[in-house]
Amino acid sequence: MWSIRLRTLKMIMEASKDSYPMEFGAFLKAEHEIIYEILMLPGTVQGDHHTLFNLYHKGIDFSVVGSVHSHPSGVALPSDADISMFSNTGQIHIIVASPYRISDYQAFNRKSEKIDLKIL
Protein backbone atom coordinates (compact mmCIF):
# COMPACT_ATOMS: atom_id res chain seq x y z
CA MET A 1 0.00 0.00 0.00
CA TRP A 2 1.27 3.45 -0.91
CA SER A 3 1.87 6.08 1.78
CA ILE A 4 2.86 9.74 1.80
CA ARG A 5 4.60 11.71 4.51
CA LEU A 6 2.34 14.41 5.97
CA ARG A 7 4.99 17.10 5.45
CA THR A 8 5.20 16.17 1.76
CA LEU A 9 1.43 16.38 1.32
CA LYS A 10 1.40 19.74 3.13
CA MET A 11 4.14 21.01 0.79
CA ILE A 12 2.07 19.90 -2.23
CA MET A 13 -1.02 21.68 -0.90
CA GLU A 14 0.92 24.90 -0.19
CA ALA A 15 2.55 24.86 -3.64
CA SER A 16 -0.90 24.30 -5.19
CA LYS A 17 -2.33 27.27 -3.25
CA ASP A 18 0.60 29.42 -4.37
CA SER A 19 0.01 28.43 -8.01
CA TYR A 20 -3.76 29.05 -7.91
CA PRO A 21 -5.56 29.79 -10.26
CA MET A 22 -2.99 27.93 -12.37
CA GLU A 23 -2.24 24.23 -12.00
CA PHE A 24 0.75 23.06 -10.01
CA GLY A 25 2.69 19.98 -11.11
CA ALA A 26 5.68 17.94 -9.95
CA PHE A 27 6.98 14.39 -9.79
CA LEU A 28 6.84 12.11 -6.75
CA LYS A 29 9.88 10.46 -5.16
CA ALA A 30 9.45 7.36 -3.00
CA GLU A 31 11.28 4.55 -1.32
CA HIS A 32 9.52 1.30 -0.35
CA GLU A 33 6.16 2.79 -1.50
CA ILE A 34 6.54 5.78 0.87
CA ILE A 35 6.37 9.12 -0.94
CA TYR A 36 8.81 11.41 0.82
CA GLU A 37 9.56 14.25 -1.60
CA ILE A 38 8.51 16.04 -4.77
CA LEU A 39 10.73 16.83 -7.74
CA MET A 40 9.99 20.10 -9.50
CA LEU A 41 11.42 20.29 -13.00
CA PRO A 42 12.89 23.48 -14.47
CA GLY A 43 10.90 24.68 -17.46
CA THR A 44 7.54 23.36 -16.21
CA VAL A 45 4.69 25.41 -17.69
CA GLN A 46 1.64 25.97 -15.51
CA GLY A 47 -1.66 26.87 -17.14
CA ASP A 48 -5.24 27.25 -16.01
CA HIS A 49 -6.13 23.77 -17.32
CA HIS A 50 -2.76 22.09 -17.76
CA THR A 51 0.78 21.53 -16.55
CA LEU A 52 3.47 20.81 -19.13
CA PHE A 53 6.65 19.12 -17.92
CA ASN A 54 9.99 19.57 -19.68
CA LEU A 55 11.09 15.95 -19.33
CA TYR A 56 14.58 16.70 -20.65
CA HIS A 57 15.32 18.05 -17.16
CA LYS A 58 14.11 14.92 -15.36
CA GLY A 59 17.24 12.85 -15.82
CA ILE A 60 17.51 9.27 -14.60
CA ASP A 61 16.18 8.96 -11.07
CA PHE A 62 14.84 5.58 -10.01
CA SER A 63 13.20 7.10 -6.92
CA VAL A 64 10.68 8.94 -9.15
CA VAL A 65 7.49 6.87 -9.02
CA GLY A 66 4.80 9.12 -10.45
CA SER A 67 3.36 12.61 -10.56
CA VAL A 68 1.24 15.09 -8.67
CA HIS A 69 -0.74 18.02 -10.00
CA SER A 70 -3.53 20.29 -8.89
CA HIS A 71 -6.99 20.88 -10.28
CA PRO A 72 -8.01 24.47 -9.44
CA SER A 73 -11.58 23.52 -10.45
CA GLY A 74 -11.97 21.59 -7.20
CA VAL A 75 -12.54 18.22 -8.91
CA ALA A 76 -9.86 15.60 -8.14
CA LEU A 77 -10.70 13.31 -11.05
CA PRO A 78 -8.39 12.66 -14.02
CA SER A 79 -9.02 14.31 -17.38
CA ASP A 80 -8.37 12.50 -20.66
CA ALA A 81 -4.91 14.12 -20.75
CA ASP A 82 -4.25 12.93 -17.17
CA ILE A 83 -5.24 9.37 -18.08
CA SER A 84 -2.81 9.40 -20.99
CA MET A 85 0.01 10.78 -18.83
CA PHE A 86 -0.64 8.34 -15.97
CA SER A 87 -0.17 5.35 -18.24
CA ASN A 88 3.25 6.61 -19.34
CA THR A 89 4.87 8.24 -16.32
CA GLY A 90 4.86 6.07 -13.22
CA GLN A 91 3.06 3.83 -10.79
CA ILE A 92 1.17 6.37 -8.66
CA HIS A 93 -0.34 9.75 -9.43
CA ILE A 94 -1.99 12.26 -7.13
CA ILE A 95 -4.50 14.96 -8.03
CA VAL A 96 -5.11 17.63 -5.40
CA ALA A 97 -8.12 19.91 -5.65
CA SER A 98 -9.01 23.40 -4.51
CA PRO A 99 -9.34 24.52 -1.69
CA TYR A 100 -6.26 22.35 -1.01
CA ARG A 101 -6.97 20.99 2.45
CA ILE A 102 -5.14 17.84 3.56
CA SER A 103 -8.21 15.78 2.61
CA ASP A 104 -8.56 17.32 -0.88
CA TYR A 105 -6.67 14.71 -2.89
CA GLN A 106 -7.14 11.46 -4.74
CA ALA A 107 -4.51 8.90 -5.75
CA PHE A 108 -4.56 6.80 -8.91
CA ASN A 109 -2.54 3.97 -10.40
CA ARG A 110 -1.17 3.99 -13.96
CA LYS A 111 -4.56 2.64 -15.19
CA SER A 112 -6.31 5.70 -13.63
CA GLU A 113 -7.99 3.52 -11.02
CA LYS A 114 -8.46 5.10 -7.59
CA ILE A 115 -6.12 3.70 -4.96
CA ASP A 116 -5.71 4.24 -1.23
CA LEU A 117 -2.93 6.53 -0.06
CA LYS A 118 -2.11 6.46 3.65
CA ILE A 119 -0.81 9.64 5.30
CA LEU A 120 2.16 9.07 7.64
Task: Spell out what each predicted region is.
Residues 1-64, 73-120:
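Conserved beta-strand-loop surface patch within small alpha/beta domains used
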Residues 67:
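Cys-dependent condensing catalytic cores that perform Claisen condensation/acyl-transfer
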